[in-house]
């Protein structure tokens, strides 16, 4: 089946699909606070989703392309679930967030199919995969159209990997008590086994969102990157996120001695946002298997336990948390009680001495991750490093921060 036909088959209208912003029914919606964050983007009036320009540009999307798609959404006069929010158009049609981003992805998919240069074709496939992931963002459970966009993203990513430098292997990992999960092992040129970074991504991202991290930072240093999806999304969608947030990643770590391309004696974990919750748990629970753990904007305690902090984050992010926890109809009070159990300090881990070297990078005044959380991580480690990343200029400092983190990881792996 051709890619175009696959797209048509997946998105063929069958019934009235639920609109993304209606999937989580929290009772205590408050006023939307203005938020700006390097890792999560910013709240913009009249948009349900946070607009994450930095990360989308970092993943290879042209800023003008972002504005073009946003303009098509804004200009639509189709029915919306909330007339005050542009990105709530009902149904898979013009103006709908998923429709417009998926349509943009198909443009690049067609370019990829027509391209004779394999490497350039690989770039086009990767571009399409990224756009399909933006279409599916923020990846709420039960969003049928988003899940179809994710399927197309994974397919485009596999096509890209066949054409881009290095090698990617799709791997299946067995997890007792449930369905197996699929991960992607990205390997640089040369002979393995390679030192490897196990990526622990944020709750509003897919494992295929981190190719730029591998290509620009790990591959040039001869380091492989292994990704899996976080519980409840993508290839890990059959697993619910629980207080044992590191369960899937632990089983992957335990399987690495049987993976011939990975040097299981030289493995580090890298956690973005809530992925840092996973990575820090691994530092405590699997310290013999890890040489180092790095975190960026970690969500490990304050946001999970402090009501005032939770009031400062956007509705969309609270919806993502509720969706991952399977609490689609919960009040904010019920959600708050449950989130508290995910705090690594409440769990009795953070604050105890940890033998694993840990680095934590943070931005001042980050509403999702306070400086205190990063200090708690690094002060708990026998070999801790605290890294403050200045906000402006945001892109340059983000790149510089990632370079410093990669240098730190490399010294402990190589």
Curated annotation (Swiss-Prot):
InterPro entries given in the database record: AB_hydrolase_fold (IPR029058), FrsA (IPR043423), FrsA-like (IPR010520), FrsA_esterase (IPR050261)
Annotated Gene3D superfamilies: alpha/beta hydrolase
Keyword Protein biosynthesis belongs to the record: no
E.C. designation(s): 3.1.1.1
Catalysis: reaction(s): a carboxylic ester + H2O = an alcohol + a carboxylate + H(+)
Sample GO molecular function, one term: carboxylesterase activity
Record's keyword terms, sorted: Hydrolase, Serine esterase
PANTHER family attached to this UniProt entry: DIENELACTONE HYDROLASE DOMAIN-CONTAINING PROTEIN-RELATED, ESTERASE FRSA
NCBIfam families, alphabetized: PRK05077.1
Function field: Catalyzes the hydrolysis of esters.
Family membership noted in the UniProt record: Belongs to the FrsA family.
Protein name, UniProt field: Esterase FrsA
């Amino acid at each position: 089946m051709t890619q175009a036909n696959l797209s048509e088959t997946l998105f063929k209208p069958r019934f009235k699909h639920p609109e993304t912003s209606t999937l989580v029914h929290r009772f205590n919606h408050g006023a939307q606070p203005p938020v700006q964050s390097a890792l999560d983007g910013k709240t913009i009036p009249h948009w349900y989703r946070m607009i994450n320009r930095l990360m989308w540009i970092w993943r290879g999307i042209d800023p003008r392309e972002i504005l073009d798609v946003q303009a098509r959404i804004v200009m639509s006069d189709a029915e919306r679930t909330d007339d005050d929010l542009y990105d709530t158009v009902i149904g898979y049609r013009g103006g709908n967030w998923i429709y417009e981003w998926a349509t943009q992805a198909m443009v690049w998919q067609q370019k990829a199919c027509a391209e004779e240069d394999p490497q350039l074709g690989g770039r086009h496939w990767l571009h399409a995969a990224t756009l399909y992931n933006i279409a599916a963002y923020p990846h709420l459970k039960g969003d049928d159209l988003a899940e179809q966009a994710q399927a197309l993203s994974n397919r485009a990513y596999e096509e890209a990997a066949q054409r881009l430098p290095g090698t990617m292997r799709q791997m299946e990992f067995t997890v007792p008590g449930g369905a197996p999960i699929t991960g992607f092992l990205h390997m640089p040129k040369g002979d393995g086994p390679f030192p490897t970074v196990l990526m622990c991504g944020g709750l509003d991202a897919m494992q295929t969102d981190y190719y730029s991290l591998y290509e620009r930072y790990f591959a040039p240093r001869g380091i492989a990157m292994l990704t899996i999806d976080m519980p409840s999304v993508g290839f890990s969608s059959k697993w619910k996120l629980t207080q044992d947030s590191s369960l899937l990643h632990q089983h992957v770590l335990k399987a690495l001695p049987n993976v011939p391309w990975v040097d299981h004696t030289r493995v580090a974990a890298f956690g973005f946002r809530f992925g840092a919750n996973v990575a820090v748990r691994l530092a405590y629970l699997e310290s013999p298997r890890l040489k180092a753990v790095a975190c960026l904007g970690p969500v490990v305690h304050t946001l999970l336990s402090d009501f005032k902090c939770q009031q400062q984050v956007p509705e969309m992010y609270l919806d993502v948390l509720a969706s991952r926890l399977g609490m689609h109809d919960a009040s904010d009070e019920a959600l708050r009680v449950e989130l508290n159990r995910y705090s690594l300090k409440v769990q009795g881990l953070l604050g105890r001495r940890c033998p694993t070297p840990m680095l934590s990078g943070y931005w001042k005044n980050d509403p999702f991750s306070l400086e205190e959380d990063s200090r708690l991580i690094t002060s708990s480690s026998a070999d801790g490093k605290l890294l403050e990343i200045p906000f402006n200029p945001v892109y340059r400092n983000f790149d510089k921060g990632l370079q410093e983190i990669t240098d730190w990881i490399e010294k402990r792996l190589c």
